[in-house]
Amino acid sequence: MKLSVNDLNVFVNTPKDIAKLCEDLSRLGLEVESCIPCIAPKNVVVGKVLEKAPHKNAEKLSVCQVDVGKEVLPVVCGAKNVAPNQFAPVALKGAIIGSTTIAKTELRGVESHGMICSSIELGFPKINDGILELDESVGELVLGKELHEYAPFNTHVLEISLTPNRGDCLSVLGIAREISAFYHTPLKPIKALNFTPTSDLITLSADENIESHLAYYLICNHSLKTPLNIKLSLAHNNALSENDLNNFIEFSAHFSGVILNAYSLNKTPIDLIIKNDENNLESVYINHQKRSTIVIKHQDQKDLSECLLLEASYTDPVSLSLKLHALKDKTLQKDNALVYRSTRGSNPNLSDGLNFLSAHLKAAILESKQTEHSLKDCALTFQLEDITEILGLVIEAEKIQNILKNLGFKVSTKEPNSKPQILEVIVPNFRHDIKTIQDIAEEILRFVGIDNLVSKPLHCVSSKNSNPHYDTHRFFENLKHKALACGFKEVIHYVFYSKEKQQKLGFEVLEDPLELQNPITTELNTLRTSLVCGLLDASLRNKNLGFKSIALYEKGSVYNSKREEIQKLGFLVSGLQKKESYPHAKGKAWDFYSFAECVSRIIGDFSLEKLTTQTPINHPYQSAKIIQNNEIIGVIAKIHPKVIQELDLFESYYAEIDASKLKRPAMLLKPFSIYPSSVRDLTLIIDENTAFSKIKKALKDAQIPNLSEILPLDIFKESGNTIALSVRCVIHSLEKTLNDEEVNSAVQKALEILEKEFNARLKG
């Protein structure tokens, strides 16, 4: 949005401090992106061309006698449009035009005492080719008067960035309203034209479903020569055209904010119909011929007649935007600038636009018509405390009312004696953005100033909003990242597998009534009951591709014999744990405990117990149940050598874990001792069928003071059914350094419990 300060002065007296004006507009939310002075240079005066004669030594030059008030000067000029009796700006001796200082000079043998200037040479936008022709629209032309003494040639051009909801400020009148409200200066309204209809040529009819508001003036005896002040205003806004009628329409729309159009007519009866076209867009038909699509596309006016039908229109911006969005896939003829102005909200006071345009056309109004639609008022009711709560700032009731009244709101007190005080506000029809009490608060804040808000800390209590599904997802994502860090590669397989292969490996299968009715292929004829089968297939493919070190991880669904879905984790390692590299010249193969340790780094600490039942896939002596939190969560085993041989695999190990039984570890703080610990190693003679886990549990349940940890060290076969089990007892206190007597006491109590529970004794 571009406009000059001179344009604003049509509606309001602007302050002389332009920098302060720009700063205040930006505070109001109308951000001034640039402010460019447009001031004519000094020693450029109003002159009148008295005579024009051809240059004796140059065909394209002419010698003009120019009256500059005090004297008549000969000036050599090369412009084609220079002519006698023409007023034009003349740069006299000493004037600086661009980077050139004007001086008396000789051009092709003829003296020239100045320069007749174009608008571009004066630092203004291009108005026309050749010199700038002056007229009385800029003020009374006095020969010899400095050009910068005329307001249009001594102004500033502002470029204002508007938010999409402020369509009311897409006009000079809209910006002037804001200035008037902020500086408490009166707004100069557009004068209403008094006229008496002298014809009855227009018959206006509109369909019932028409939403647009329309008003018409039939005029004649109009003047269609664009005056200089209009040209300058449009040129500043990059909207000047060669069509005079379009210039008047654009100028009036730019100033008033009303969408305007004009139709060239003969002075005959006019059948004016408003109805929807083939795209369901409201259109104007004159004598059954479509002439325009309301607020979307206007026809260019070329052949002008004595009579013109002026049209002012308004369509609700929200309704229009929805219609255009519904037709986004269709190719529509539309004027983008017109649609931009319409969809952001034009001025619904149609008479303002028609009166402004008619006055500048200096036309006689023969007749006026308008549709019978009327805009509904938007009323908002609120308490003063509501504004205080929203802004966090106490503002006096009188100040709030004055701000709103200055902005054009109608404010009344509802139930004057009530406490708290209740206000009812009628929103002006040109403010399409005001819908709620929050919008009212924003208007008040704009004029109070956001800098005047008191900074306060935000008092809030944040409750933990836990999402169990997300927590579970993050838990398994973290497990996956740990597996990747340990060298495992994630794999994904179908949930379908071969029933025969699963049975051969010893895994359960679905009950016959629950089997797939229409399997994809014979190789995928059932639902998998274990992840291990797919991992074995993937291991074989990688072996065949030349990989010697294979570590795979998978999380997925498996099904039990009742076809109930279970989420499981699967791990499989095959071949080398470490590739051939110093110090392992032949590589390092996996072993059971290395694999178990690797899995524990991923899922957390666990213990192992011997499997009570064996399956064909498991090695009978290297397989175990995985125990975590006193619960069986899965199986870990070496693949049976027969299976390895049949499948042609490297030596392999697998672990399969029920994902539902894995628990997120609680973050618990535990104290640690700053005092040294004591270690006692014991070798016990004990029954070979006694599991170390039972020994550990018995000592833990006994809660022996200062005995913090017991670890297995070694095992030896003794005579008969006994073994020699070496264990290490770690003893320390959180409170002090223990002496030998206290350490020996803890060891003695441990031996007593072991002897009582397991018939264990120290090896002699």
UniProtKB/Swiss-Prot annotation:
Enzyme Commission code(s) on record: 6.1.1.20
SMART domains named in the record: B5, FDX-ACB
GO MF terms held by the record: ATP binding; magnesium ion binding; phenylalanine-tRNA ligase activity; tRNA binding
One family name in Pfam for this protein: FDX-ACB
Domain (FDX-ACB) ranges: 673-763
Reactions performed catalytically: tRNA(Phe) + L-phenylalanine + ATP = L-phenylalanyl-tRNA(Phe) + AMP + diphosphate + H(+)
UniProt keyword Protein biosynthesis present: yes
InterPro entries: aa-tRNA-synth_II/BPL/LPL, DNA-bd_dom_put_sf, Fdx_antiC-bd, Fdx_antiC-bd_sf, NA-bd_OB-fold, Phe-tRNA-ligase_IIc_bsu, Phe-tRNA-ligase_IIc_bsu_bact, PheRS_beta_core
Gene3D superfamilies listed in its UniProt record: 3.30.56.10, Bira Bifunctional Protein, Domain 2, Ferrodoxin-fold anticodon-binding domain, Nucleic acid-binding proteins
Domain tRNA-binding as annotated: residue spans: 38-148
GO terms (BP aspect): phenylalanyl-tRNA aminoacylation
Residues binding Mg(2+), per UniProt: 433, 439, 442-443
UniProt entry keywords in alphabetical sequence: Aminoacyl-tRNA synthetase, ATP-binding, Cytoplasm, Ligase, Magnesium, Metal-binding, Nucleotide-binding, Protein biosynthesis, RNA-binding, tRNA-binding
Cofactors that this protein relies on: Mg(2+)
Subcellular location: Cytoplasm
Highest taxon of the lineage: Bacteria
Keyword NAD among record annotations: no
A GO cellular component annotation in the UniProt record: phenylalanine-tRNA ligase complex
Domain spans labelled B5: 375-455
Note accompanying the cofactor annotation: Binds 2 magnesium ions per tetramer.
Primary location group: cytoplasm
Assembly behavior: Tetramer of two alpha and two beta subunits.
PANTHER family: PHENYLALANINE--TRNA LIGASE BETA SUBUNIT, PHENYLALANYL-TRNA SYNTHETASE BETA CHAIN AND LEUCINE-RICH REPEAT-CONTAINING PROTEIN 47
Family, per entry: Belongs to the phenylalanyl-tRNA synthetase beta subunit family. Type 1 subfamily.
Protein name: Phenylalanine--tRNA ligase beta subunit
Gene this protein is translated from: pheT
